[in-house]
Regions:
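Generic structural hydrophobic/aromatic packing signal, biased to beta-strands
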Residues: 119, 147, 170, 221, ...
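Generic structural motif
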Residues: 157-159, 219-221, 234
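Extended, charged amphipathic alpha-helical segments
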Residues: 233-354
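Short, flexible beta-strand-to-coil junctions
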Residues: 140-141, 148-155, 224-231, 237-243
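Primarily cytosolic, helix-rich juxtamembrane/linker segments of multi-pass membrane proteins
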Residues: 175-176, 208-211, 227-228, 246-248, ...
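Globular "head" domains of long coiled-coil molecular machines
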Residues: 211-215, 219-231
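A generic short-segment signal for beta-strand/edge and adjacent turn/coil regions
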Residues: 112-118, 129-130, 191, 203-208, ...
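Extended, helix-rich architectural segments
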Residues: 1-215
Length: 354
C-alpha cells in the first residue's frame, strides 16, 4: 500500500535526480530497441513502436507475409496462461512452514487454506487474467514483462487492480541483488485521468488552461519505483515543462508494486532474451520465402509477355481479354508468354524445413 507524503516542501532536487537516472537507464535500453522493433514487427505487430511513434489506426502488417510467428506467440501465451495462472482455478496455495510442529501445522492449515481461497477469489474477480496475458505476450516477444500490482478503489469487486506495462513504456534497472526492482514508466494521461490517479497533486495553472481548451489532451508523466532498503520509494513527475519538471506525487511502498520478470537472462544484460529472438532468423526467412512465393504466383497467374518490336503491335493498346485480336507484322512472332524460371516446390521445401 502506498503511503503518500503530504509535506509541501518536497526536495526540489528529486525530479532532476530521478530524470538523470532515468536518462542513463534509457540510454542503455536504446541498444535493445532495434532488436525489439524487429521482433515485434514480425511476431506482434500491433505492439512495438520503439524506434518510431506509431499512430492510432496505423497499418502495421505491411511487411508481414507469413503469420506463423504471430499464431505461435498467441498459442504460447495461451499455454502459459492455462498452465501457470489458469483462470478460475486455484493456481497457488498456502501451507505451514517447516518450523512448525505437526500439531501446529494441522491447526493452522485450515486457516491458511481459507486465506488462499480468499486471495484467489480477489484474483478471479479482478482484471488479472487479462493483464497477465498481455505480460506473457511481451515476455515471449520482447523477453521482459512488467505487471503493476495496485490496490483497487473501495467498493470495487476485487481489492486488487493490475495493469500490464508495455515494454515500449518501461525502462528497467537491476538492483544490488540482481532483480529488476528499479522501474521507470512513461504515461500519457488526460486531466481526468491525472486527477483520478494523483488525488493530492496540485496542478500548474498552465496545464489546467490547456486541459480546459482540450479535455482529451494527454500530458506526459514519468513514474519511478526505486528501492530504498527494505522499502520502495515512489515518484511521479510531470514532464510537460522540460525546463522545470514538477514532482506531483511521492510516497513509499512496503513491498514492490511492480513485478518485472524475464524469459532468459544472459550474463551482463539487464533485459531478457525471448523465444522470438532465438527464432528470428527462421521467422524472417519464412516471411521472405512466402513473399517470393506470392510474387511468383502472381506472375504465374497473370504471366509475363514478350513481343517483337515490329512496328505493328503496340503494347499500350493490348488488352488480354477473351476474344481479343492482337495484330502482328508478317514474319513476327507476335505476343508470346515468357517461360517461368521459378519452381514452387523448392519454396515449399524451404518452408517445410523451417
Amino acid at each position: 500500500m502506498l503511503e503518500q507524503e503530504k509535506n509541501p516542501d518536497m526536495n526540489l532536487d528529486i525530479p532532476q535526480r530521478i530524470l538523470s537516472h532515468f536518462e542513463a537507464a534509457h540510454k542503455k535500453r536504446q541498444n535493445w530497441e532495434t532488436l525489439w522493433d524487429e521482433c515485434y514487427d514480425y511476431a506482434l505487430p500491433q505492439r512495438g513502436g520503439f524506434t518510431s511513434v506509431p499512430r492510432a489506426g496505423q497499418q502495421r502488417v505491411n511487411k508481414v507475409y507469413d503469420a506463423t510467428a504471430m499464431d505461435a506467440v498467441d498459442q504460447l501465451a495461451s499455454s502459459l496462461l492455462g498452465n501457470l495462472t489458469p483462470t478460475w482455478s486455484q493456481w497457488f496455495g498456502l501451507k505451514p512452514g517447516p518450523d512448525l510442529s505437526p500439531a501446529e501445522a494441522d491447526k493452522i492449515s485450515p486457516i491458511l487454506e481459507k486465506a488462499a481461497k480468499t486471495i484467489q477469489d480477489h484474483f478471479d474477480r479482478s482484471n488479472f487474467a487479462v493483464e497477465i496475458h498481455q505480460c506473457y505476450l511481451d515476455l515471449i516477444v520482447g523477453g521482459t514483462a512488467s505487471l503493476y500490482f495496485e490496490e483497487a478503489q473501495t467498493g470495487e469487486l476485487s481489492a486488487f487492480k493490475f495493469s500490464s506495462a508495455p515494454l515500449t513504456h518501461v525502462t528497467l534497472e537491476e538492483g544490488a541483488g540482481g532483480y529488476l526492482d528499479t522501474v521507470y514508466r512513461r504515461l500519457s494521461l488526460t486531466i481526468e485521468q491525472l486527477r483520478a490517479r494523483y488525488t493530492q497533486a496540485v496542478w500548474p495553472a498552465a496545464l489546467i488552461q490547456r486541459a480546459d481548451k482540450d479535455p482529451q489532451e494527454q500530458f506526459k508523466i514519468l513514474e519511478a519505483v526505486v528501492p530504498n532498503g527494505l522499502q520502495y520509494n515512489y515518484y511521479a513527475i510531470l514532464m510537460e515543462d522540460m525546463s522545470a519538471q514538477e514532482l506531483i506525487a511521492h510516497g513509499t511502498f512496503e513491498t514492490a508494486p511492480v513485478i518485472s520478470f524475464r524469459w532468459v537472462k544472459s550474463p551482463g544484460e539487464i533485459y531478457g532474451r525471448s523465444p522470438v529472438m532465438k527464432a528470428l532468423p527462421d521467422i524472417k526467412t519464412a516471411n521472405k520465402v512466402v513473399e517470393l512465393i506470392l510474387k511468383n504466383a502472381s506472375i504465374a497467374v497473370t504471366g509475363i509477355w514478350q513481343a517483337d518490336d515490329d512496328g505493328v503491335l503496340n503494347p499500350a493498346n493490348i488488352e488480354l481479354t477473351p476474344g481479343s485480336i492482337i495484330p502482328k507484322a508478317i514474319g513476327s512472332k507476335g505476343l508470346q508468354p515468357l517461360d517461368m524460371p521459378g519452381r514452387f516446390d523448392i519454396s515449399q521445401l524451404v518452408l517445410d524445413s523451417l
